[in-house]
């Protein structure tokens, strides 16, 4: 029986509903609507069960000149439904108005007063300096800032954290304990560090010391030296504020490049190259070429044939005759230089045996023959007096 009822539900249900309405039993719920509508929750069923759709369907089905009891009830219920729809629609208006008001509140710009053109260090230092005792607590600093600047009187309160951080993280502020026995206590005083007065110099509150002050004074003195002094009665023109070393005129550049405007010091390159070297221990006039070290008086040696008898058994080795082309480097202090005679530094010594002597005919060039133990020979030369300092290696030719 149920299969026969639910099979033609789409077409037969409307007809059954119209028959029931014609019979005047609209108050009794139909089994089709009770079972089918609850079990099937489609959109069409929801639209059919809605009050507005039901009233519209009742008007259509009970249209014409036929008015039954159900139709009368529907006509009586129509004002209620319309009133209900109006009552349901009426809350939508206030909600829309509230939503619109919320959007308007969000779109309203947030007004914040302009921040004063000072850093927090400057503001805190200003508050401490204006105090009678030269020290204030954190609450007193906040009260001073709120009373002096409108920015701190608004709803924004994040500046209080900035004040606390700047007090505790900068060395220019010193905390003075109210009770030394309770260093962890609050309401301590804050005052300016007397050792950090440079931070508040020239009316400018700086976070740290300026590092370009020395360079600025040196450059200012360098540029000042380039300008020629005027007459005694003529005042010097003051430099303009926009003038800079880069944007100077060509005449200024030529004046700045003159030797008088350059950096004058004993360590300047021009000063070092222009002045000859003078020994501090000796005030005698310097020669044409000066040595950067002290040279010991060493008489010029003759050629090697005169030195041969000094050797025992002819045990000598040839040594490269360095410095023969540069007699000025090995010249003695205050002695005249003989460019014709070759100069040698190491004297002869028979402290160590060496290979037999070979004549200059086999060697093909004139050589100075000295012992193989060259440091001993140099030590013997140093025993006579302070020997010259050699700035290069001694080259030896081993046969």
Swiss-Prot record:
<comment type="function">
    <text>Plays a role in hair follicle differentiation.</text>
</comment>
<dbReference type="GO" id="GO:0001227">
    <property type="term" value="F:DNA-binding transcription repressor activity, RNA polymerase II-specific"/>
</dbReference>
<keyword id="KW-0539">Nucleus</keyword>
<keyword id="KW-0805">Transcription regulation</keyword>
<feature type="compositionally biased region" description="Low complexity">
    <location>
        <begin position="32"/>
        <end position="54"/>
    </location>
</feature>
<dbReference type="InterPro" id="IPR050211">
    <property type="entry name" value="FOX_domain-containing"/>
</dbReference>
<feature type="compositionally biased region" description="Pro residues">
    <location>
        <begin position="228"/>
        <end position="238"/>
    </location>
</feature>
<dbReference type="GO" id="GO:0006357">
    <property type="term" value="P:regulation of transcription by RNA polymerase II"/>
</dbReference>
<feature type="compositionally biased region" description="Gly residues">
    <location>
        <begin position="55"/>
        <end position="66"/>
    </location>
</feature>
<dbReference type="GO" id="GO:0031069">
    <property type="term" value="P:hair follicle morphogenesis"/>
</dbReference>
<dbReference type="GO" id="GO:0000981">
    <property type="term" value="F:DNA-binding transcription factor activity, RNA polymerase II-specific"/>
</dbReference>
<dbReference type="GO" id="GO:0000122">
    <property type="term" value="P:negative regulation of transcription by RNA polymerase II"/>
</dbReference>
<keyword id="KW-0238">DNA-binding</keyword>
<feature type="region of interest" description="Disordered">
    <location>
        <begin position="1"/>
        <end position="112"/>
    </location>
</feature>
<dbReference type="InterPro" id="IPR030456">
    <property type="entry name" value="TF_fork_head_CS_2"/>
</dbReference>
<dbReference type="Pfam" id="PF00250">
    <property type="entry name" value="Forkhead"/>
</dbReference>
<dbReference type="InterPro" id="IPR001766">
    <property type="entry name" value="Fork_head_dom"/>
</dbReference>
<dbReference type="GO" id="GO:0030154">
    <property type="term" value="P:cell differentiation"/>
</dbReference>
<dbReference type="GO" id="GO:0009653">
    <property type="term" value="P:anatomical structure morphogenesis"/>
</dbReference>
<protein>
    <recommendedName>
        <fullName>Forkhead box protein Q1</fullName>
    </recommendedName>
</protein>
<feature type="DNA-binding region" description="Fork-head">
    <location>
        <begin position="114"/>
        <end position="205"/>
    </location>
</feature>
<dbReference type="GO" id="GO:0005634">
    <property type="term" value="C:nucleus"/>
</dbReference>
<dbReference type="InterPro" id="IPR047518">
    <property type="entry name" value="FH_FOXQ1"/>
</dbReference>
<dbReference type="InterPro" id="IPR036390">
    <property type="entry name" value="WH_DNA-bd_sf"/>
</dbReference>
<dbReference type="GO" id="GO:1990837">
    <property type="term" value="F:sequence-specific double-stranded DNA binding"/>
</dbReference>
<dbReference type="InterPro" id="IPR036388">
    <property type="entry name" value="WH-like_DNA-bd_sf"/>
</dbReference>
<keyword id="KW-0804">Transcription</keyword>
<feature type="region of interest" description="Disordered">
    <location>
        <begin position="211"/>
        <end position="263"/>
    </location>
</feature>
<dbReference type="GO" id="GO:0000978">
    <property type="term" value="F:RNA polymerase II cis-regulatory region sequence-specific DNA binding"/>
</dbReference>
<dbReference type="InterPro" id="IPR018122">
    <property type="entry name" value="TF_fork_head_CS_1"/>
</dbReference>
């Amino acid at each position: 029986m149920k299969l026969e009822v639910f099979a033609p539900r789409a077409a037969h249900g409307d007809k059954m509903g119209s028959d029931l309405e014609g019979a005047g039993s609209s108050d009794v719920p139909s089994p089709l609507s009770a079972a089918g509508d609850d079990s099937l929750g489609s959109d069409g069923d929801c639209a059919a069960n809605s009050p507005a759709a039901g009233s519209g369907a009742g008007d259509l089905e009970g249209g014409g000149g036929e008015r039954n009891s159900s139709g009368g009830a529907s006509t009586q219920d129509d004002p209620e439904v319309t009133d209900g729809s109006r009552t349901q629609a009426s809350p939508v208006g206030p909600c829309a108005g509230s939503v619109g008001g919320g959007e308007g509140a969000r779109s309203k710009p947030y007004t914040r007063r302009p921040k004063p053109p000072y850093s927090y260090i400057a503001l805190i230092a200003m508050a401490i300096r204006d105090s009678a005792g030269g020290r204030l607590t954190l609450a007193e600093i906040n009260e001073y800032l709120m009373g002096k600047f409108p920015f701190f009187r608004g709803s924004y309160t994040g500046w209080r954290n900035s004040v606390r951080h700047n007090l505790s993280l900068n060395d220019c502020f010193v905390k003075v304990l109210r009770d030394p026995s309770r260093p962890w206590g609050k309401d301590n005083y804050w005052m300016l560090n007397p050792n950090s007065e440079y931070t508040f110099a020239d009316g400018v509150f700086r976070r740290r010391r300026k590092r370009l002050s020395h360079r600025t004074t040196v450059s200012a003195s360098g540029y000042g030296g380039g300008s020629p002094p005027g007459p005694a009665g003529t005042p010097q023109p003051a430099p303009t504020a926009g003038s800079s070393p880069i944007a100077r005129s060509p005449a200024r550049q030529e004046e700045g490049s003159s030797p008088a405007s350059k950096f004058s010091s004993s360590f300047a390159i021009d000063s070092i190259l222009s002045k000859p070297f003078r020994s501090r221990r000796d005030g005698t006039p310097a020669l044409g070429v000066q040595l950067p070290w002290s040279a010991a008086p060493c008489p010029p040696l003759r050629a090697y044939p005169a030195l041969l008898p000094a050797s025992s058994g002819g045990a000598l080795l040839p040594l490269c005759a360095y410095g023969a082309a540069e007699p000025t480097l090995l010249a003695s202090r205050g002695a005249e230089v003989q460019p014709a005679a070759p100069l040698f530094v190491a004297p002869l010594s028979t402290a160590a045996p060496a290979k037999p002597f070979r004549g200059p005919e086999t060697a093909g060039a004139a050589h100075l023959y000295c012992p193989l133990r060259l440091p001993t020979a140099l030590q013997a030369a140093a025993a006579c007096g302070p020997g010259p300092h050699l700035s290069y290696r001694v080259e030896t030719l081993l046969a």
